[in-house]
């Protein structure tokens, strides 16, 4: 599964894991992305999205219809 949020565009960041002795090794910081299904009344069907928890809060705030409308304008395939 992709670790990119379809709503916010959050993608993995890269940095270092620093041990107690301060040795640095490369690591990846993944966003908290989940696969969720929403019913969109304006489309009359369910839509499955890869969405981060921040994206879920955005959907709670703005509503799924407004978020899906913006995704369709961006050209995201639903």
Curated annotation (Swiss-Prot):
Keywords from the UniProt entry: Ribonucleoprotein, Ribosomal protein
GO CC entries: ribonucleoprotein complex; ribosome
GO biological process per UniProt: translation
InterPro entries in UniProt: Ribosomal_bL28, Ribosomal_bL28/bL31-like_sf, Ribosomal_bL28_bact-type, Ribosomal_bL28_sf
GO molecular function per UniProt: structural constituent of ribosome
Stored Gene3D superfamilies: Ribosomal protein L28/L24
PANTHER family (UniProt xref): 39S RIBOSOMAL PROTEIN L28, MITOCHONDRIAL (PTHR13528), LARGE RIBOSOMAL SUBUNIT PROTEIN BL28M (PTHR13528:SF2)
Family: Belongs to the bacterial ribosomal protein bL28 family.
UniProt cross-references to HAMAP family, sorted A to Z: Ribosomal_bL28
Descriptive protein name: Large ribosomal subunit protein bL28
